[in-house]
Amino acid sequence: GKEVTEPGTDRIMVFQDFNQLLPWKTVEKNVQYPLKIQGLKDKTKLREISDAALEKVDLLSSRTLYPHQLSGGMKQRVAIAKALALKPQIILMDEPFASLDAMTRNHLQEELMKLHQKEKVTVIFITHNIQEAVCLGTRILVMAKQGGIKMDVPNTIPKPVTPASEGYGQMWDMFNKALHQEG
């Protein structure tokens, strides 16, 4: 790897708050906005890229809607489409599904797994949810209160992972114990 010393479009952040879209822009224009900031002006190319990104998150038919017309899960998928449009090497996700209802969260977890497999992009996913970590992660780090790494464990359970998957219970117990230990 190489040392990261400044921001770059090869690393994109998706935040927990799903109200990160510009309310006066349509879904399509929200996805295109970072591309325009990078200097892309060709309207045909902008449309091609935004359509492809929205297709990946199953929102192409919603491209003319405004953020106030979207559910929380749809807003989060638009944020992911914005990230994908820039073709990053790494997507950093800070508890992106934490404030969503259980059904939407499960759906977006499935969609994230499909995107990860299709796009071959590295996703660094921050969560306090053990189930989410075990189901989504290929490598799971547990942070200590002081900011260090308490555990670093490869997740060898074959994807897709469900609570019924062999090894899920043992892994869940291991992380639950680690989270409740001091230090």
What are these regions (language model features)?
Residues 43-62, 114:
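Conserved ABC ATPase "signature" region
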Residues 80:
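Hydrophobic anchor residue at the start of the ABC signature
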Residues 1-17, 24-25, 37, 163-168:
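ABC ATPase NBD coupling module
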Residues 28-36, 47, 51, 154:
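Short helical segment in ABC ATPase nucleotide-binding domains corresponding to the A-loop/adjacent helical element
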